[in-house]
Amino acid sequence: KATGREILFSACNWGMEEPGEWMRAIGAHMYRSTGDIMDNFVSFTDIVKSQLNKLCMSGNHCFNDMDMLTVGMEGKGNVGLGKVCSYEEYRLQFVLWCLCGVPLMMGADLRTLAPEYRALMLNPALLRINQDAECRPPYVVRRDSVCIPNPDDAQAPWAHPADTAFVLLRHLTDNEFALFYANLSDADAEVHCEMADMGLPVTGGVALDMTDVFSGEHLGPQKDSFNPHIKAHDCRLFLCHLVKDNA
């Protein structure tokens, strides 16, 4: 403070002793909530899953820092451990960091970053969600298991791998919502969500008017349930508004 310059107080104890409960009180502007990230799918999804019940411990002036982005690192550097992520896996990571309001710090070398990852991290819709003025964290609408074929077991032809799907909803400025679906399983699958899980019963007289962030497709009003088919290790993201249900 004596310098007259603004200071960013970034605190780190690698998630020990529940930092989200007291970091704001000591003046931290952002705090590391987990161990160090590695450049692979298991590492970043384990980090996210460890924070799903702590999303409320992040907000204006004190943000949950789930570590740097490994998007586009492609196994380079000292965090390059394990199988290199696919584009869809890196996109999943970036969308989650944006949706959860995580401070966005690149680990990749900007000079050699592949064009598709540069475009991903400059996506204006995703950055707008991350930088939303109200800084509200998302909340978990549903945390579930996907249902995938299990052809090797005649007695149990369908498998339900644990903790492989979740749905998040974030309330944005101007009564807009970001609705996110993740499929963390190793197979393509539907991820299920009832609108009632978001507090929108089918008899409530309202629906969600949805637009796909990745494709730009306007899906129109959706009510009752919306269960997108999602590739393995991938996600879907929609921007939504509440509209009257005229049906």
Predicted regions and their residues:
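Alpha-helix-loop-beta-strand connector modules within alpha/beta enzyme cores
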Residues: 2-4
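Carbohydrate-binding surface patches
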Residues: 91, 97-100, 105-107, 157-202
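Hydrophobic, well-ordered secondary-structure elements that form the walls
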Residues: 179, 210, 233
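C-terminal beta-strand-rich structural cap/linker in extracellular carbohydrate-active enzymes
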Residues: 220-247
